[in-house]
From Swiss-Prot:
InterPro entries (alphabetical): Actin, Actin/actin-like_CS, Actin_CS, ATPase_NBD
Gene3D superfamilies, per database record: 3.30.420.40, Actin, Chain A, domain 4
UniProt name for this protein: Actin, non-muscle 6.2
Species for this entry: Hydra vulgaris
Enzyme class: hydrolase
GO cellular component labels: cytoplasm; cytoskeleton
Function of the protein: Actins are highly conserved proteins that are involved in various types of cell motility and are ubiquitously expressed in all eukaryotic cells.
E.C. designation(s): 3.6.4.-
Annotated compartments: Cytoplasm, Cytoskeleton
Length: 376
């Protein structure tokens, strides 16, 4: 990058974690929980300088005295005041930059309501005085990060999953399917099935422990019934986990029963199709001529696709649904937890992208609706 060029900022706001950094980098500089906490009680100590709100890791560490709120639900911003706090924290505390000096690329969920994109645009230009900004769809960025412009992305994070077919860089809105089943639901389900084993996890603090157990020990079985039999007849699948207080717990079939929910949502009482069927349904909503390209370029993205065994299982399940001669390829990049951010970093540093930014001047002339004309 030339010295006179200012690095663009790339901010990927997820339901669970916010990923932020500089365009051209290969990984985000800052990754922190998308939470805002407010004190539950009036401060007693004089001169403690208690703040009226905490964001991210600080909110997480003080969660005992705070009420925690997630401003992004199912991938979509629902609380703008808190969202503004998260962005403020991102710029000033995490990245330590002056937002008025850097163009910023934000990400949005597929099928994000129009009013939401306008609000994001308005806050960037009016509250943070950004010189330029752009809003890109998360799944499209994941596809770019894998070096493709055509394919179908299964993006599964903490709050929502989507299957997004993309042709020549454009998402096909009529074929996008949203599935309200993601990481947080899997954590809740693991809490429930661990309770059946006699371990009690109930508070929000304990939920974080269960999330860690899920991330470290869960995996997807290639054949669920077979795996259940193996687990019942031997202890080969059992693993132990040490809790923060030193107590050690043992976990067996829960390891693969937890992520099996992605393929069988009925486990948590949801009447929806699993991720394999949703991906297939999404492909079937597309023009018959491009289906072959989608089957051969099925890209996994997001933290909830990090389970070992998930790609093989997807390959098996989609092969069973697709026409018998169809070539099916599941792409699971090792860095897929951050592939949305990485795609944003790639896009914002392309020389051809520089004329795509919405400038402050364009915003002042046209208002927030400019976002629909320039970002699609």
């Amino acid at each position: 990058m030339a010295d006179d060029e200012v690095a663009a900022l790339v901010v990927d706001n997820g339901s669970g974690m916010c990923k932020a950094g500089f365009a051209g980098d290969d990984a985000p500089r800052a990754v922190f929980p998308s939470i805002v906490g407010r004190p539950r009680h009036q401060g007693v100590m004089v001169g403690m300088g208690q703040k009226d709100s905490y964001v991210g890791d600080e909110a997480q560490s003080k969660r005992g005295i705070l009420t925690l709120k997630y401003p992004i639900e199912h991938g979509i911003v629902t609380n703008w005041d808190d969202m503004e706090k998260i962005w403020h924290h991102t710029f000033y505390n995490e990245l330590r930059v002056a937002p008025e000096e850097h163009p910023v690329l934000l990400t949005e969920a597929p099928l994000n309501p129009k009013a939401n994109r306008e609000k994001m645009t308005q806050i960037m230009f009016e509250t943070f005085n950004s010189p330029a900004m752009y809003v890109a769809i998360q799944a499209v960025l994941s596809l770019y990060a894998s070096g493709r412009t055509t394919g179908i992305v299964l993006d599964s994070g903490d709050g929502v999953s989507h299957t997004v077919p993309i042709y020549e860089g454009y998402a096909l809105p009529h074929a996008i399917i949203r599935l309200d089943l993601a990481g947080r639901d899997l954590t809740d389900y693991l809490m429930k099935i661990l309770t059946e084993r006699g371990y009690s996890f109930t508070t929000t603090a304990e939920r974080e422990i269960v999330r860690d157990i899920k991330e470290k020990l869960s995996y997807v079985a290639l054949d669920f019934e077979q795996e259940m039999q193996t687990a019942a007849s031997s202890s080969s699948l059992e693993k132990s986990y040490e809790l923060p207080d030193g107590q050690v717990i043992t976990i067996g079939n829960e390891r693969f029963r937890c992520p099996e929910t992605l393929f069988q949502p009925s486990f948590i009482g949801m009447e929806s199709a699993g991720i394999h069927e949703t991906t297939y349904n999404s492909i079937m909503k597309c023009d018959v001529d491009i289906r072959k390209d989608l089957y051969a370029n099925t890209v996994l993205s997001g933290g909830t696709t990090m389970f070992p065994g998930i790609a093989d299982r997807m390959q098996k399940e989609i092969s069973a649904l697709a026409p018998p001669t169809m070539k099916i390829k599941i792409i699971a990049p090792p860095e897929r937890k951050y592939s949305v951010w990485i795609g944003g970093s790639i896009l914002a540093s392309l020389s051809t992208f520089q004329q795509m930014w919405i400038s402050k001047q364009e915003y002042d002339e046209s208002g927030p609706s400019i976002v629909h004309r320039k970002c699609f």
